[in-house]
Amino acid sequence: MSQSRARKVLIVGAGPVGALTALSLHRRGWEVEVWETRDDPRGQDAAPSNLRSINLAISSRGLEALRSVDPSIAENFLEEAIPMKGRMIHHTDGKQESQLYDPIGGQSINSISRPILNQRLVQSLPEAVKLRFNTKLKHIDFKNRVAYASHKQETSLLPGEESEKDKKQNTEDEDGTAFDLVIGCDGSWSKVRTAMMRAERIDFSQSFIPHAYIELHMPSDPASPGGYAMDKNHLHIWPRHAFMLIGLPNKDGSFTLTLFIPFSSLELLDTRESAAAFFREHFPSAVDIVGEKVLLDDFEKNPRGNLVTINCTPSAWSSHAILLGDASHSMVPFYGQGLNCGLEDVRVLSSILERHHISPTTTLALGETDPELELALKAYSDERQGDLKAICELALQNYTEMRSHVLSPLHHLRRQVDKVFTTLFRSAPQATLSLMEPFPTKKVRGWTSLYEMVTFRPDVGYSEALRKERWQKDVVGYAGWIGGVVGVGAAGVFAATMAKKWLERR
């Protein structure tokens, strides 16, 4: 009889998703090894190591994923995060308009810096988890279940970037690392995904939007309360139709600003003078707060980032490989769900492993195919795919809403309709999450805004949120047709009453 041993998992990528995956599987009893291209973040200053990462907004889905592994981690993060109760719209005339995310329940999303989040998650990993930094995946021999890496003395590059000097300094791990399962948490340009596509027929798509993003900085203001020059409990948006500026608060009183602008418009801002005129025309209030020199210095020196949507299916191969986070489903950042969805992947995978009774130990030889684990990974890929496609679609839709629709009277009308209908036909409270069932609410009853379902209802899958919203849009259209309304008014309430039987069925 073969001797029992712990299953060996190799996780490629020690970002937030990779680190949480490592902690989750370690606590299940797996032998865990993690490879990361970049330097060890532990003990470093948590100031951003690069300026290509948009501030993160962590909300209920991400927090529930953290709690599913270790409740104390989620609570610790909330102490370092800043709650944002809504959007603060900055109009060109200087007026500001607050749009609450949850006018009835008062729930908030939370601003946190990516370096802090990542550092704290890596710090939470116990010594039993083998961490190898400055280690870059070179290739995977899936036939023999062995991964090979190269090592660098130090690196400050992003994944996917490598200078000629770095290439010469790399040394390959000739022995390689054997595994039962390799998990790709290595981002949009995943090398694990590339290796899987050589071993399995995988449908893959990527599409870029025509906008670049540039990170800017609003320093703290010593003369303002807490150092905040703007209300710290809002996500600030300067929507200008073709482009927009957003601002998320930091603990030190500063704001991380991000400009989203078409590449075609960006090409016209090729001098400091043209950039200054652009900011003065479209974002005068931001210029007044930040200062023109600081804003232009950041604009000139900071890199231009691309925004891409990536989908691949299946996201698992045999019992030996699976993709999580951006490696499987990179999305544009306009719904604030990239991080939350990636962390939720970990919770869903853990739930499916539990449902399939996957033991942390096995009597199979290292690297031998496990039919039961293969079924579990396939179940994850099949069940998760609809939700991943839905949130990528919703993120693209919100791309238009944030920069343009928030200025539309119809957007305000729809918000009022949602508020009235939610009061009249309140949906059932959030269902208790179960280890065996990641999304216990299979069908949302009553009326709930799309934003609430996506952001504050981790018991509801993204695909169900999208289905419900499409139906609610049909009801709103019906209400408008019945009443010819331009406000909620009596006709809207009448139509709501007419729709009551529908709502109870749906």
Curated annotation (Swiss-Prot):
Which parts of the sequence are annotated with region: Disordered?
Answer: 153-175
The GO terms this record gives for MF are:
FAD binding; kynurenine 3-monooxygenase activity; NAD(P)H oxidase H2O2-forming activity
Record localization: Mitochondrion outer membrane
Tell me which InterPro entries the record gives. FAD-bd, FAD/NAD-bd_sf, Kynurenine_monooxygenase
User: Cellular component terms, GO, for this chain's entry?
Assistant: mitochondrial outer membrane; peroxisome
One GO BP annotation is: anthranilate metabolic process
EC number(s) from the headed UniProt entry: 1.14.13.9
Cofactor dependence: FAD
The biased composition feature labelled Basic and acidic residues covers 162-171
State the top-level EC class.
oxidoreductase
UniProt keyword annotations, A-Z: FAD, Flavoprotein, Membrane, Mitochondrion, Mitochondrion outer membrane, Monooxygenase, NADP, Oxidoreductase, Pyridine nucleotide biosynthesis
Q: At the top level of its lineage, which domain of life is listed? A: Eukaryota
Pathway it works in: Cofactor biosynthesis; NAD(+) biosynthesis; quinolinate from L-kynurenine: step 1/3
Which Gene3D superfamilies does the annotation name? FAD/NAD(P)-binding domain (3.50.50.60)
Q: Which reaction does it catalyse?
A: L-kynurenine + NADPH + O2 + H(+) = 3-hydroxy-L-kynurenine + NADP(+) + H2O
Q: What does this protein do?
A: Catalyzes the hydroxylation of L-kynurenine (L-Kyn) to form 3-hydroxy-L-kynurenine (L-3OHKyn). Required for synthesis of quinolinic acid.
Q: What family is this protein classified in?
A: Belongs to the aromatic-ring hydroxylase family. KMO subfamily.
Q: Which PANTHER family match?
A: KYNURENINE 3-MONOOXYGENASE
Identify this protein by name: Kynurenine 3-monooxygenase
Its taxonomic path starts at:
Eukaryota, Fungi, Dikarya, Basidiomycota, Agaricomycotina
